[in-house]
């Protein structure tokens, strides 16, 4: 069985929920404290043993490439000024993994974005990490899925429970059998209508997929939003070859919409020793 050493991170979206901030800046570069959100995703992949990462980009996404590239002039200035801690952080962001880029030429959905990286992946199993969710866990969320893949040899989809009122926002699984945190899946449903979801187990932006998924994506018809949906292709693949779901452990932070982004920033700041005390005083002083 081939090891999972490659990952795809889709980053071609327009970031319309954060306009006008994302008119000229990629949504993925919006910072949580002192790191852009996409760095948290790359760090998770690297901690899981991923060596090669392909980031699927679009127009106006050059800042992502610049962030993970080395900046010798900046490093030299930091070194000359004795700012060793900042120098270490800057160098760390360029050494996380081998990072490559491919452009999604049309906005045709997540499934289409994944297809854009087919040549890079070749005939190997691979991971997919979406940038709307930062997950804090002792074992990286995607590593938990990799472990299940290595036990079963089958594709694995990361899920977590969501409130029933929110199920229409996600891909949802219809579980067949349960073994610990692992599920056999009867059906995958992309964004079911309110009140029709078969469960409250939602697909949460972490996948380990076998290369066969590309054949299903190639023939996949447009689905929700008139886009090529990855969930629809996974559903078809599941009909031919079992796809598992795994309820991964970890605290999930939704940074794909404004309120979640603000909540995440506040929580991360409260965990930071240099900010906690003063921020706590500030919040108390608001008298909310």
UniProtKB/Swiss-Prot annotation:
Gene3D superfamilies: Spore Coat Polysaccharide Biosynthesis Protein SpsA, Chain A. It comes from Staphylococcus aureus (strain NCTC 8325 / PS 47). It catalyses: alpha-D-glucose 1-phosphate + UTP + H(+) = UDP-alpha-D-glucose + diphosphate. Its EC number is 2.7.7.9. One of its GO terms (biological process) is UDP-alpha-D-glucose metabolic process. Keywords: Carbohydrate metabolism, Nucleotidyltransferase, Transferase. This is UTP--glucose-1-phosphate uridylyltransferase. Belongs to the UDPGP type 2 family. The gene is gtaB. Catalyzes the formation of UDP-glucose from glucose-1-phosphate and UTP. This is an intermediate step in the biosynthesis of diglucosyl-diacylglycerol (Glc2-DAG), i.e. the predominant glycolipid found in the S.aureus membrane, which is also used as a membrane anchor for lipoteichoic acid (LTA). Pathway: Glycolipid metabolism; diglucosyl-diacylglycerol biosynthesis. Disulfide bonds: none annotated. The keyword Nucleotidyltransferase applies. The keyword Transferase applies. One of its GO terms (molecular function) is UTP:glucose-1-phosphate uridylyltransferase activity. NCBIfam families: galU.
């Amino acid at each position: 069985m081939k090891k999972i050493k490659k990952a795809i991170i889709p980053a071609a979206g327009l970031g319309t929920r954060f306009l006008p901030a994302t008119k000229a800046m990629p949504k993925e570069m919006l910072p949580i404290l002192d790191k852009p959100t996409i760095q948290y995703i790359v760090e998770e992949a690297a901690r899981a043993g991923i060596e090669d990462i392909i980031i699927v980009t679009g127009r106006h996404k050059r800042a992502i490439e610049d962030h993970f590239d080395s900046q010798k002039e900046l490093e030299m200035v930091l070194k000359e000024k004795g700012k060793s801690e900042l120098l270490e952080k800057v160098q760390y962001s360029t050494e996380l993994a081998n990072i490559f880029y491919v452009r999604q030429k049309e906005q045709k959905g997540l499934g289409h974005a994944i297809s854009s990286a087919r040549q890079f992946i070749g005939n190997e199993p691979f991971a997919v990490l979406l940038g709307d969710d930062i997950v804090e866990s002792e074992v990286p969320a995607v590593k938990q899925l990799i472990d299940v893949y290595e036990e079963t040899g089958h594709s694995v989809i990361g899920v977590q429970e969501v409130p029933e009122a929110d199920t229409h926002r996600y891909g949802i699984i219809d579980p067949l059998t349960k073994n610990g945190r692992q599920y056999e899946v009867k059906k995958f449903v992309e964004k079911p209508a309110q009140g029709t979801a078969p469960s409250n187990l939602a697909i949460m932006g972490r996948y380990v997929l076998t290369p066969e998924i590309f054949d299903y994506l190639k023939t996949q018809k447009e689905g929700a939003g008139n886009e090529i949906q990855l969930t629809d292709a996974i559903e078809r693949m599941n009909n031919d070859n079992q796809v598992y779901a795994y309820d991964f452990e970890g605290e999930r932070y939704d940074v794909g919409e404004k309120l979640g982004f603000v909540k995440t920033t506040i929580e991360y700041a409260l965990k930071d020793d240099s900010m906690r005390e003063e921020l706590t005083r500030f919040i108390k002083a608001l008298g909310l």
